[in-house]
Amino acid sequence: MEILFVASEVAPWSKTGGLGDVAGALPRALAARGHAVSVVTPRYGTIDPHAHRLRPLHRALDVRGEPTTLWVSRDRAPVYFVEHEHFFGSRRGLYGEAHDYGDNAERFAYLARAALALPGALGLRPHIVHLNDWQTGLVPFLLRREHARDAALAGARTVFTIHNLAYQGVFSKHVVPALGLPWDVFRYEAMEFHDQLNFLKAGLVFADALTTVSPTYAREIATPQGGVGLDALLRHRARDLHGILNGIDVEEWDPATDRHLPARYSAADLSGKAACKSALQRELGLPERPDVPLVAMIGRLAEQKGLDLVVAALGELLARDLQLVLLGTGRPELEEAFRRAARERPDRMAARIGFDEGLAHRMEAGADLFLMPSRFEPCGLNQMYSLRYGTIPVVRAVGGLEDTVEDFDGWSRGTGFKFRDYHPQAMLLAVRRALEAHRDRRAWRAMMLRGMALDFSWDRSAQAYEALYRSLAAP
């Protein structure tokens, strides 16, 4: 099949979160399965065409009478970078710097039209146009309204993926004329949302199929508690909504080959994991104790990630015989709470405020447990990294965490520990269960091996998307 994939960020060229990872990995996995995949994204000012060996295309796109030039990557799934100096090239950020850019509606309406102009200019004939998050939400409507007679897009079906429903691209209704949209889109059945224009809602209303990044998150967003104001629409489209779990880069995240680790290991030989633990304790200034459970946390210090639960429980956590290590940045009050705990209990706590890719790998390898108490989690990556590295996750049973971690039954089943209530005591109970299980080395090793045997590759995800694409393209 021929697939056009449109995203506002694509790793490794541009990334602010999980969307960039998906847009960088899924098209390649689909191409490896024999599909012809092209990706469209902006050429932001942070992307140096020469450093990335991008090739200029001497064919201009006509976007509402304005010529647009392109760059293309040298990939099996080529990435086409849309050039626009004012909207993209002159900006240091993707969506904003201290605050969102005031013209984000115009910027991403431009991306939507450029993406739809590209097939005709390059001789592509996509069967599927796959959109991602609010930045591409106008594409399904524009395909129907402005490209209904476009031979290059004849019969193309649209898939719209929600990576995080909390980010919706909501703008003043006064931008409608500036975007070249007709006023009939500004109604409840289309893009109107509390007297504003909602780009994400546009995608949900007009796309042929909807997906999100885990089966449980697909169910959660169709409830009043998880729907962020769009649950009724998602229930209305329940037959078209599919939860497909993200994958991870199993080459980058492989303890047998990981270049960031002081010692490598595998399910066949776990001895290197103990060496990684000792090295991590030394690196972070903790007492070097092979017997003590080492608990890691990595990620944004934000309310979504449940770090307020950890702060509330820090006293009880650090009263136990364990070591807690944290890597991340975010809300200043959370940063200070972890810094203060590390100062007060340097034998039990280490906090690194910031981000360090190598240290993230070493923490996944050196820890015994990974704590992820998210308030909500569309998919989550770190629990999958942890399972692959033989590090047992302790998670709140939401979104992708529910789908990827099986609760330990106390004997022979399970890959981690789960709790449901969003409360410090519920989290502490799960941690206590994990610490008790850690004392049984035989059962613990068996749990590690069960997790390490799971398949979280992008090929598994690509197969699920492939099945959805085929169902849409079938006559």
UniProtKB/Swiss-Prot annotation:
GO-annotated molecular function: alpha-1,4-glucan glucosyltransferase (ADP-glucose donor) activity; alpha-1,4-glucan glucosyltransferase (UDP-glucose donor) activity
GO cellular component: cytosol
Binding positions (ADP-alpha-D-glucose): K15
Entry EC no(s): 2.4.1.21
Keywords in alphabetical order: Glycogen biosynthesis, Glycosyltransferase, Transferase
Transmembrane segment boundaries: none
Family annotation (InterPro entries): Glyco_trans_1, GS/SS, Starch_synth_cat_dom
A GO biological-process term: glycogen biosynthetic process
The keyword Transferase belongs to this UniProt entry's keyword annotation: yes
Pathway this chain belongs to: Glycan biosynthesis; glycogen biosynthesis
One Pfam family in the UniProt entry: Glyco_transf_5
Catalysed reactions, semicolon-separated: [(1->4)-alpha-D-glucosyl](n) + ADP-alpha-D-glucose = [(1->4)-alpha-D-glucosyl](n+1) + ADP + H(+)
Gene3D superfamilies: Glycogen Phosphorylase B (3.40.50.2000)
NCBIfam families found in the cross-reference section: glgA (TIGR02095), PRK00654.1-2 (NF001899)
Family membership: Belongs to the glycosyltransferase 1 family. Bacterial/plant glycogen synthase subfamily.
Function: Synthesizes alpha-1,4-glucan chains using ADP-glucose.
Protein name: Glycogen synthase
Annotated source species: Anaeromyxobacter sp. (strain Fw109-5)
Gene encoding the protein: glgA
